[in-house]
């Protein structure tokens, strides 16, 4: 029985809010039109090559592209003034870029929530100017259709990061475990955050196994990486496997890789990795020292794939 619908919400770059579909739809005078496109699987193109006399071709990889979504909204109003106000509010919720004058500026956020999968978000910017479609003056009819085209530079739908951590309760050295998992369909680029002072040793295991049965294994099943000794003035360190970020940096964003003797982190967490305990340890620290593991949750679709 089909007894629930997806809820589609917009959190504007100006702080505004609109519910476009689902419970509460149209309360702000705007609701989702029909035939939205680009919401489903993330855009992927595969790369193939063939030699001069090869029959067929050989797979060489894939490229994940930015996501373009095309949709329309119906803007309503009970009077000419109300329609203009709703139309203006909707337009101000969007921009082509993050406001360069606002230190807290942000992109527009689209959220789709389903009962099974919960909320998943995209960060969006306009890729071209919004259009307008109406046979008559909307100030007379109280209704107009606005086609929209927007781009998500990060094409994966995302949820709040999963957090786990460990804290040194006493003494200057100790060891413990943190729990890691990746229930999504995408490789996970984790982030470690450690306190200072201290010298931390963090896991960087390789993984093997079928989906839902991944375990540390393969070439480096017990590999660890020792971070450089951190002084209190450095304020701690972040290890970020996102290739667009500094891999190891202190709280002042100073690159620490030059102090690591040529060692760095190698391994992503594969899709559908079950909960697994990972070892962490520290020396030369103080009671209360701790480590936090941030686990991003990225999905290629707005629902499903668990």
Model-identified regions with their sequence ranges:
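Short beta-strand and beta-hairpin "edge-sheet" elements
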Residues: 104-157, 298
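Oligomerization/assembly interface segments of phage tail-like spikes and tubes
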Residues: 50, 54-84, 141-156, 278
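Short polybasic amphipathic segments
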Residues: 3-11, 108-110, 201-207, 246-248
């Amino acid at each position: 029985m089909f007894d629930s619908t997806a809820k589609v919400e917009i959190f504007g770059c100006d702080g505004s809010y609109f519910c476009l579909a689902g419970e509460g739809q149209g309360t702000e005078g705007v609701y989702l039109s029909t035939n939205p496109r680009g919401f489903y699987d993330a855009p992927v193109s595969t790369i193939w090559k063939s030699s001069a006399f090869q029959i067929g071709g050989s797979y060489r990889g894939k490229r994940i592209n930015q996501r373009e979504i095309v949709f329309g909204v119906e803007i309503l109003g009970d009077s000419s003034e109300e329609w203009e106000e709703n139309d203006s509010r909707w337009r101000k919720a969007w921009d082509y870029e993050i406001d360069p004058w606002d230190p807290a500026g942000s992109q527009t956020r689209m959220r789709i929530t389903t009962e099974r999968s919960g909320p998943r978000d995209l960060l969006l910017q306009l890729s071209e100017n919004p259009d307008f479609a109406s046979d008559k003056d909307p100030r007379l009819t109280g209704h107009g259709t606005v086609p929209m085209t927007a781009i998500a530079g990060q094409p994966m739908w995302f949820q709040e990061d999963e957090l786990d951590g460990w804290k040194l309760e006493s003494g200057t050295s100790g060891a413990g475990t943190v729990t890691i998992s990746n229930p999504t369909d995408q490789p996970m680029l984790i982030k470690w955050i450690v306190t200072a002072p201290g010298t931390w040793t963090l896991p960087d295991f390789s993984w093997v196994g079928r989906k839902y049965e991944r375990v540390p294994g393969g070439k480096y099943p017990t590999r660890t990486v020792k971070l450089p000794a951190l002084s209190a003035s450095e304020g701690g360190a972040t290890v970020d496997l996102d290739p667009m970020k500094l891999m190891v940096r202190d709280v002042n964003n100073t690159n620490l890789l030059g102090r690591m003797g040529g060692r760095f982190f190698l391994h992503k967490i594969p899709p559908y990795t079950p909960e697994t305990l990972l070892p962490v340890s520290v020396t030369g620290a103080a009671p209360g020292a701790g480590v936090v593991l941030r686990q991003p949750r990225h999905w290629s679709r707005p629902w499903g794939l668990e």
